[in-house]
A protein has these predicted regions:
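Conserved N-terminal beta1-alpha1 strand-loop-helix module at the mouth
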Residues: 1-84
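Glycine-rich phosphate-binding active-site loops on the catalytic face of alpha/beta enzymes
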Residues: 85-95
Length: 95
């Protein structure tokens, strides 16, 4: 199974994506571990959270987790998020 299929399989299995928004970077690792302990394996880190790219990198250190970037507003943000390890991208509607 390829990366895309793995990501989709985990999302389908868990049926829950936890959104991490506005969490201080210093608390991110503990929050991620607590979510994993509670069975949450799919996370979206919003890019309007200070240190979001570092939080994505931190989350990706764990096994069996899917990590995405949310509130992505530009191609540049998309590239940075993917470089940080995001496995999916979410963007709000924009006119």
């Amino acid at each position: 199974m390829g990366n895309k299929e793995n990501v989709l399989a985990i999302i389908e299995q868990t049926k829950v994506i936890s959104i991490i928004r506005g969490v201080k970077e210093t608390y991110a690792a503990r929050l991620i571990d607590a979510l994993l302990d509670g069975g949450i394996r799919c996370l979206e880190i919003t890019l309007n959270t200070p240190g979001a790219l570092n939080i994505i990198k931190e989350a990706r250190k764990r096994e069996g987790i899917v990590v995405g970037a949310g509130t992505v507003l530009s191609l540049e943000d998309t590239q940075k998020a993917l470089e940080a390890g995001a496995q999916f991208i979410l963007s709000p509607e924009r006119e």
